[in-house]
């Protein structure tokens, strides 16, 4: 019933204030400005239905706990507020961004303020399932809390811009010859009918879409090996798979200009079909 009153292209929330994102004001003394002192999470909405909102909020709270930020509201209260902001947008296909910051106060390293709550929703569709990604590689120069979604993303920004500058879609971050993950996605491979995915550890985010890819493999009878793998293995894989909140499952066709994958389209198609169907169903169920 509330949809008829929608009015914002991009809606935002900050500590109780709601408005068009372009007009929202955040205090100069916000700790995000000086220290990058915040954790975040991202999900998507399809026709106003949220995808896996419980899992994303749980990961956001877990990240806050890891860095000592105490959220000023409960999980259910955050989800309720996210739904309100989503409903303020004039389209229902959205990226939904949530963040807890260290709050606003005098610039000093020790936190002495209540945490800040940020929500930002803007129009964005999930990736076309038929798109084939072009990837590049770069050394992983990030710091040691990669398993926590903090906003200290300068190395990721540099990697993503390096990819964009040569017409690529993503950048694979490598520690020597070991593949970690992409600048803003997880990457895994199919080899001889088996999915090989790096274990969630300090240098790799525990991706929710990766979890769902692994669950889909289990349902479809595809074996899974959680182990590290090399760039050489990736380039020789039957398929290279990229996943993120907005990319339930897509294949890469080139890495550093070299053609990759394309040898197990049947397994890839089965996984992709299941994951996109699950995404649409989850959003429809969330709409009620």
PLM feature segments, named:
Residues 76-106:
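Short, acidic/charged, Gly/Pro-enriched secondary-structure junctions
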Residues 3-84, 109-288:
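Helix-start/capping segments and mature chain N-termini
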